[in-house]
From Swiss-Prot:
One of its GO terms (molecular function) is ribosomal small subunit binding. Keywords: Cytoplasm, Ribosome biogenesis. It comes from Lactococcus lactis subsp. cremoris. This is Ribosome-binding factor A. The keyword Cytoplasm applies. Transmembrane segments: none annotated. It is found in: Cytoplasm. The keyword Cytoplasm applies.
């Protein structure tokens, strides 16, 4: 149980730091509208899945953002190493958060009802 609490705390810290790095360090216009919505860590803190949402619904924008995030993974890891006090920075994997789109569809259905 204690390990879960620690991984949750580290995940929240990683989410906050990556959002800050996106706003202040990454100059790539492809990630301008990206927002980090969640981070899921493995129990041993070696892997982190970083979920992001995008303001644009265009498939081309989504692909560009995914490419830019993958390209900036090294920058994220090096900045996290400077900012965080954990022994090993987890390997980062970026995944689009589909729950935002799902919520929008539910809202749309409810407004039609």
């Amino acid at each position: 149980m204690g390990n879960s609490f620690r991984s949750d705390r580290v995940a929240v810290e990683i989410q906050r730091e990556i959002n800050d790095i996106l706003r202040n360090k990454v100059r790539d216009p492809r990630v301008q509208d990206v927002n980090i919505t969640d981070v899921q860590l493995t129990g041993d803190l070696s892997q982190a899945t970083v979920y992001y949402s995008l303001l644009s619904n265009l498939a081309s924008d989504n692909e560009k953002a995914a490419t830019a995030l993958k390209k900036a993974t090294g920058l994220f890891k090096s900045e996290l190493a400077k900012r965080m006090t954990i022994f090993k920075i987890p390997d980062l994997t970026f995944a689009k958060d589909e729950s935002v789109e799902y919520g929008s569809k539910i809202d749309e259905i409810l407004t039609w009802a």
